[in-house]
Amino acid sequence: MLRQDAAPERARVIGLLDAFQAAERAGAEAVGRWIAACSDPRLRGGLRVIRARDARHAALAEARLRALGGEPAARPSRELAALCGVVADPGVSDRSKLALLLGRLPAREDTALDELAREAEGDAETHALLETITDDERASVRWLRHMHEALEREGT
């Protein structure tokens, strides 16, 4: 829990959580639309898990920000909204969507979410929440890379 004299820190953590919940919610919605247009049953199955994780991450972040006295108000960035639009577009191939998503990620394990967790170190509960969510995100990225490689090998 945050120290009682940590109002500025609380506000900062609420802002981090708010931005994160908005991004995860937008991602879950876009992946849901991708699932509807996806023709590969393997990809569809994995995307269902990713969508469920993203929706749960959004709910967890929102619950934490509310516990800290905040209200969700953030919207996804323009860049994220544009990416979600491509992911949700039935006219874009699954391979292209995977390539676009994976191309935005660093090759190393350290991610923007790791940085977000570090930024929340002053709040032990939020920090632990974000560290655990980071593990989920890494699993999703590993699976997306595996699927991209499989689709590339198959030429589909």
Predicted regions and their residues:
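Amphipathic alpha-helices that form helix-helix packing interfaces
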Residues: 27, 57, 64, 105, ...
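Terminal targeting/low-complexity segments that flank the catalytic cores of oxidoreductases
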Residues: 1-17, 91, 149-156
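Short, contiguous alpha-helical
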Residues: 127-155
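Acidic/histidine-rich alpha-helical segments that form the ligand environment
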Residues: 13-34, 82-135
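Short alpha-helical hairpin
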Residues: 1-7, 29, 79-81, 85
